[in-house]
Amino acid sequence: MQDRKNRAGGFRKRKKVCFFTQNKFTHIDFKDTELLKRFITERGKILPRRVTGTSAKWQRPLAVAIKRARHMALLPFVKE
């Protein structure tokens, strides 16, 4: 069985790029809740790198910013 990408007219997976690197961010502000909401699920969980395409360099400060926003009650810990 051939890979789908090798077949004519097959499915080609798009490479994910880091949002923060692409838009030349210098830091992530925990008060920017609209940005942080893009990286959490509807249940309030932090989305993993493999889903968002965020680089390891930016995933760590992103997680810290989300946790700070939760602690300051800007983002919910869970949504029901």
From Swiss-Prot:
GO terms for cellular component: cytosolic small ribosomal subunit. The keyword rRNA-binding applies. SUPFAM superfamilies: Ribosomal protein S18 (SSF46911). Keywords: Ribonucleoprotein, Ribosomal protein, RNA-binding, rRNA-binding. It holds the Pfam family Ribosomal_S18. Signal peptide: none annotated. One of its GO terms (molecular function) is structural constituent of ribosome. GO terms for biological process: translation. Belongs to the bacterial ribosomal protein bS18 family. Part of the 30S ribosomal subunit. Forms a tight heterodimer with protein bS6. Binds as a heterodimer with protein bS6 to the central domain of the 16S rRNA, where it helps stabilize the platform of the 30S subunit. This is Small ribosomal subunit protein bS18. It comes from Acholeplasma laidlawii (strain PG-8A). The gene is rpsR.
